[in-house]
Amino acid sequence: MSKPNTPPLPLTAKPVYLAAHAINTLVRTLPVGTAYFIGIVLITMFTGQLVHHQGSLARAALPYVRHLRWGWHRVERALERGKVSLDALFERAFTWCLTCLPVEPVRLGSERRTVPALDSSTVVRLRANKKRSALMGKGYCHRAQRAVQANLVAALTTVVLICGVRVGLVRRTRFGATCQEAVAKVFADLPQSSEQRLFSVDAGIATIEQFQAATARDALGGRLRKNVPLRRAPHPKPPGQRGRPAQPGPVVHPGAQRPEGRPDEDTTLRIGEREVRVRRWRNLHFREAPRTLIDVVRVDDPASKRPLVIGTTARAVTTAEIRVAYGHRWPIEPNFFVAQGTRAMEMPRAWSATAVERRISLALLAGSLLKAIAAACAPLPMGPWDWKAVSSAGRLANHLALQAGNFAALALQDLAPRTYRKITNAKETTEVQLPLAA
């Protein structure tokens, strides 16, 4: 049987240059003694070698620091003690993506709101010593089907379009003893922005306190619990009328099988062969927060077992745009999967608070950058048999691993480790106070 006469797949070196330029841009602003070794940490994450060595940073970095004395130790020390600001790295990576990649921010509504997405993840640490490990908390493990000790991280991403592909660029990471604590830390330290934003979150994050903290500039939209009770807003009183304050309206359960009252909007959409019913209630509020008005959208899709209930404080956004805003939340979840599968986020092998925070945060940063670069480049085939290649972070990591020598040389260009000069002519002095003899 003869082989088909087909032309060979073209190979491109553009991803190698883009990834190397990204690393070089990130570490160039760091101190001289730290930049070189933090660049090596990012190289091991970009090429997937950290996963190959089961999270051992010393073994993954050894081929790049073999020529240095105690090279692997200096890599570990730079990660744990180096002067590195994670927030500054995130902002520099975001600026690099806007400058070097065809990035188009996602905007919704007449107010042109950008869409940041926020979610949390549980990094299980079953074998870690509780007394030795830092930033430990309790989180639910789906594999063990119980609550276990873990590092709980919350990540904030900005959803953008790169060549038509939705990508989440990591902007902040925070840790806590619980997911609620980590999420609260992210909301307390949001990146500054002159634009109006609509934060897309999930059910565990869309709490009453977060809806109360939302503002007109930074609105909140997220999935609500199925059994959440809400109230209709009271009818406005005529101006100048005195008397007792107006009583709130009747109770509404938007997630119930038969919600009370009539919705303000009730439409039916045709998606493929399914008929999806979409209902909207305006000017609802929680019993504990009568001054915080929200709009609630319920989506009944035959393909899902439970209805999707979405609440938002951005009441000027249309019903279709609310559904789209919640759909933009999914790019943050692949960031966790990419960081776990190819950046060894689930195997941090770190114990101090600084090392744990930097290992997990840099893994999320490397994963989001790889996804962004892969979306901007042509699909990378794994071999001559791969005729349906796609642009993914895993394929890009495999391509960078094949070009590891050139990739490392480009990423560490104009960077060199600090050399420590050994003092050969040390002068002994007798002025140093000696300890008292026993």
Across the structure, where does each feature detected by a protein language model lie?
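Gly/serine-rich nucleotide phosphate-binding loop at the start of the catalytic core
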Residues: 2-82, 86
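Short amphipathic alpha-helical "interface-anchor" segments enriched in bulky aromatics
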Residues: 322-350
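Active-site-proximal, Lys/Arg-enriched surface segment
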Residues: 46-47, 80-165
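Electropositive, glycine- and tryptophan-enriched low-complexity nucleic-acid-binding patches
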Residues: 68, 74-77, 139-196, 296-308
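An internal, acidic/charged active-site-proximal segment
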Residues: 173-296, 382-391, 429-431, 435-438
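Short, conserved catalytic/metal-binding motifs centered on acidic residues
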Residues: 57-61, 111-126, 156, 196-205, ...
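Long, low-complexity C-terminal extensions of enzymes
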Residues: 379-438
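Basic, amphipathic alpha-helical segments enriched in Lys/Arg and hydrophobic/aromatic residues
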Residues: 345-402
